Every structure is written in C-alpha cells, then in structure tokens.
Amino acid sequence: MKYHISSSLFVLFCIVLCACNSSSVEKDGIIQPAFDLIERQIGERAADIQLEEIAPENGKETFEVEAKNGTLTLRGSSSVAICYAFHTYLREACSAMKTWSGEHMELPETWPDFSLKKQTTPYEYRYFLNVCTFGYTTPYWDWERWEKEIDWMALRGVNMPLATVASEAIAERVWLKMGLKEEDLSLIHI
C-alpha cells in the first residue's frame, strides 16, 4: 500500500512538473498551469491578470512584468517563469508574500503600476530539496500539502526538484541483475 501511494505521488509529481516545464507545448499548455497556480493563491483576482507566453532568451527561461492603469500583465517563456513573475510582482509591487510558515497577502484593490523588463535566468535548472527531505514529514503529506509545496517551488522559479521516489526499486533491480537472490534482498528490510 505504501509503495502504491509513493508511486502514485511520484507519477503525479512528474506530470505536474512536465506540464510546468515543457517548452514545446501549445500556448494554453504553459498558460493554464500558471493561471491555476495563481488562482490557488489569490482566488477570483486571478481573472484580472493577463498571462502571455514569450520566447526564451538564448534558450533560457525569461519573464516580464508590466502593471499599468490597474492592468497586470505577466509574460513568461514557461509556466514556472510566469509563476516567478507573479511572485516577483507580489513581493516588489505589493509587499505581499507566501512562505512555508505563513503569508501576508493584503492585496490592493487595483494592481499598482510596476514595470520589470525582461529578466532571464543564467541557469537552465533551478534545483530544490535534498536527500534528507524525504526522511522527515514528506512521506505523510497528502495531495493538498504536495500541491502547496509544488506551488511554492514554481513561485520561486524552481524547475528541478529532487525526486528520489522509487530509488529502492531501482536498486533492487540492479542487485538482482548482478546476481543477488530475492531472498537475500528481503533481509535488507528487516
């Protein structure tokens, strides 16, 4: 049962990550996941934000923020870039934030004017988590908690979270191919 839940979470996590990180999908393919995340953060106010896809800069993810006369437009080359643009706008223009331990999301009635011209990351991958993380509370997280963590990562521009799920199954296959017997491996879990 525990293996089934872990496998299901891993597959779902990979699907969400691919949807947020794919550069070869249609426009709605990067816009909808970003919109959904923003809607989870601010509810109906998400409908007041224009989201647009822009081309990567020299193969690197890029974003822009423009707020003028109460209209907020976020542009990005991926869902993660758009989400990071949103996070940047909240932090810089609205003095708002969401963290692991709380939030300050008192948003103004109209979006304050703000302009941040094209920002391009120098990094292809923005990594998060470590091997110890999966030994703490994550095995007991439900989908709501995982979604919160994935949203947190996207808002901060993370596009490569560590996923050690299934490493034991892979190691078992390797050991079996190397000649160990199934009964020898079962002793490991005692």
Tell me the role of every PLM-derived stretch:
Residues 29-33, 37, 54-59, 68-188:
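Feature activates predominantly on carbohydrate-active enzymes
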Residues 50-51:
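Extracytoplasmic soluble-region selector
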Residues 1-9:
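Bacterial N-terminal signal peptides that target proteins for export
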Residues 10-14:
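Hydrophobic helical h-region of N-terminal Sec-dependent signal peptides
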Residues 39-44:
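Glycine-centered helix-coil hinge/cap
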Residues 18-19:
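C-terminal motif of bacterial Sec signal peptides marking the signal peptidase cleavage site
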